[in-house]
């Protein structure tokens, strides 16, 4: 998570995909930028585009940067109620968004769970994909990572996502290795935590998170 929330985007919008609407933001550059100058960012579990704050602030001076919010628990637009939120479906949705948002090609950048989504998106060989950049991320045989793997199973218990939301309001819980303790290098400020936790107030967002987690364990 960056020290500051993302800078003001040049343009924001919503793109339609097979799983529903995805919110996107763009920074710097131009939609007419060549594929090697277009960067598409995919975040991880229980984060959203705000995780890329300082990254897009720096890179948007030389690149056209697009951040995409996918339904991993801190998104603000719930997926379609009938959407299958397997990682493969998320990857398809990313490629559908890229086709519409990156007409001249793109470099796909994924971190954490977004890295797995990006790997599967690349395997589908979208026409516009120029490069794949994987930051610290999950892999097929380490997904979810062991400290967080319990989430794949407790997601089957009714009310767990609501309980997770309540627990994440407690600082000592957030600092546990089975929460964010090993994922952040410093204590996030109130605005950053709010960006992560507040979307879970929406029952649709909680439903989506549970679907994704159940999909991992199948």
Residue spans for each PLM region:
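Short acidic-hydrophobic surface loop/beta-edge motif
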Residues: 11-17
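Alpha-helical interaction/dimerization surfaces of two-component signaling modules
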Residues: 55-58, 97
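A broad, low-specificity signal marking well-ordered, structured residues that form hydrophobic/aromatic
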Residues: 13, 22, 40
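Flexible "cap/lid" subdomain of the alpha/beta-hydrolase fold that forms the substrate-access gate
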Residues: 2, 8-9, 22-24, 30, ...
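A generic structural motif
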Residues: 60-65
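Short beta-strand element of the alpha/beta-hydrolase
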Residues: 35-44
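The serine-hydrolase catalytic nucleophile loop
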Residues: 44-56
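Non-catalytic, surface-exposed connector residues within folded enzymatic/regulatory domains
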Residues: 36, 53, 187-190
């Amino acid at each position: 998570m960056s020290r500051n929330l993302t800078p003001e985007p040049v343009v924001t919008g919503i793109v339609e995909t097979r799983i529903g609407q995805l919110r996107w933001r763009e920074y710097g550059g131009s939609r007419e930028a060549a594929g090697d100058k277009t960067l598409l960012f995919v975040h991880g579990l229980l984060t959203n585009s705000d995780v890329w704050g300082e990254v897009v602030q720096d890179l948007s001076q030389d690149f056209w940067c697009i951040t995409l919010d996918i339904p991993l628990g801190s998104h603000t637009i719930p997926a379609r109620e009938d959407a299958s939120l397997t990682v493969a479906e998320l990857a398809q949705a990313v490629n559908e968004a890229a086709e519409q948002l990156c007409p001249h090609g793109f470099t796909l950048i994924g971190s954490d769970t977004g890295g797995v989504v990006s790997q599967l998106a690349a395997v589908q060989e979208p026409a516009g994909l120029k490069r794949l950049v994987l930051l610290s991320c999950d892999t097929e045989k380490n997904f979810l990572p062991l400290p967080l793997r319990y989430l794949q199973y407790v997601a089957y218990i009714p009310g767990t996502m609501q309980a997770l939301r309540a627990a994440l309001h407690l600082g000592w819980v957030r600092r546990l290795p089975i929460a964010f303790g090993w994922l952040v290098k410093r204590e996030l400020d109130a605005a950053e935590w709010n960006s992560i936790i507040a979307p879970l107030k929406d029952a649709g967002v909680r439903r989506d998170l549970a679907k994704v987690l159940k999909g991992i364990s199948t």
